């Protein structure tokens, strides 16, 4: 018999994701599988599947389910990619990526969040394709570059161009950019040149 969280998770996938245009079978499957309630503080678990962000401590948030799905779908993952995630946060987006991508390299500047996500993903999910690092995302992770995909879960005022050098040819970056007025932007690399495509308006915590 399905528990309450499982029922809420199914409703989230149908009502918040599929109904709003998320079509990637891999993304929908991952979102239906990962128990979001494990990634939020106990006091917020009753709100785990609402269509909104939730606080996770240290001034950070876990993004609303639709935005997680939208950004993941926009990465156009096929299953063979190495992904750089800047902003591990709770580890929820990390888990979604780990379900689809070949390898996930995830960075977080707040040690407590990085350690908490590492412990959760290791103990509960036993992922073997996730590598963690505590550090500033603006600098990227040159030791593991190049990356086929990158995703930022916090917004820089201006996109750190050093990351473009760490992106593979044909690679894609999905990132919120801006201050008060933020836009989600898709960057793609073709023949060494970067093309930027504006997607939607968003609200993220600033990249620090």
Place the predicted regions along the sequence by residue.
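Class I SAM-dependent transferase core
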Residues: 1-84, 92-96, 100, 113-124, ...
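Conserved nucleotide-cofactor-binding alpha/beta core module
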Residues: 76-195
